Amino acid sequence: MPFMPVPYVIEQTHRGERSYDIYSRLLKDRIVMLGTEIDDDVANVIVAQLLFLESEDPDKDINLYINSPGGSVTAGLAIYDTMQYVKCPVSTICVGQAASMGAVLLLAGAKGKRYALPSSRIMIHQPLGGVRGQATDIEIQAKEILRMKAKLNELIVKHTGQSIERVEKDTDRDYFMGASEAKAYGIIDEIQNPRKVVGLGKEEKK
């Protein structure tokens, strides 16, 4: 995969010019970007940003933008638990796609503050796992996969209001949704019209 340089933003201050990488600049406006597959390193950065923003202002919203194919369940749950732990409401916005653990994080946003852009794609499914080794090891890993499957299904039920029977059926295979379908399912609350966005962390005044 080709290296993508990180853009920098130049700002004028009373001390002169100051440069920020784009993610640090977004963080100033309480915007966190999850734009990759989820692994432990990515989760640690997201968790650190959430905790930092809570320490800065525990009453102000955090905006978590998600464009992710999913990834590690345990890493994703670290982000999920932190979202529930911090005092700040965490608004989630899907741009592009929120699949697998990405979808779980999308639906875990503060109630009434879960959004997707019109062309977003959302996908839920059961955890994936490949196991090799002795029969006993395979049995242990299989039980753990089933435990994680039940855990994720419980979270989907909790945040969407769907029945466990429907969630178990839908997650048995890859279940794709557009923004409208995700809203009907209870994964998001609103489809965000990009034209309403007028600035970083700001919404159009009415």
UniProtKB/Swiss-Prot annotation:
Keywords attached to this entry: Cytoplasm, Hydrolase, Protease, Serine protease
Lineage: Bacteria, Pseudomonadati, Myxococcota, Myxococcia, Myxococcales
Name of the protein in its database record: ATP-dependent Clp protease proteolytic subunit 1
Pfam families: CLP_protease
Organism: Myxococcus xanthus (strain DK1622)
The protein's Enzyme Commission number: 3.4.21.92
Molecular function per GO: ATP-dependent peptidase activity; ATPase binding; serine-type endopeptidase activity
Catalytic residues, chain numbering: S100, H125
HAMAP family linked to this entry: ClpP
GO terms under cellular component: cytoplasm; endopeptidase Clp complex
Listed GO biological process terms: protein quality control for misfolded or incompletely synthesized proteins
Enzyme class label: hydrolase
Subunit record text: Fourteen ClpP subunits assemble into 2 heptameric rings which stack back to back to give a disk-like structure with a central cavity, resembling the structure of eukaryotic proteasomes.
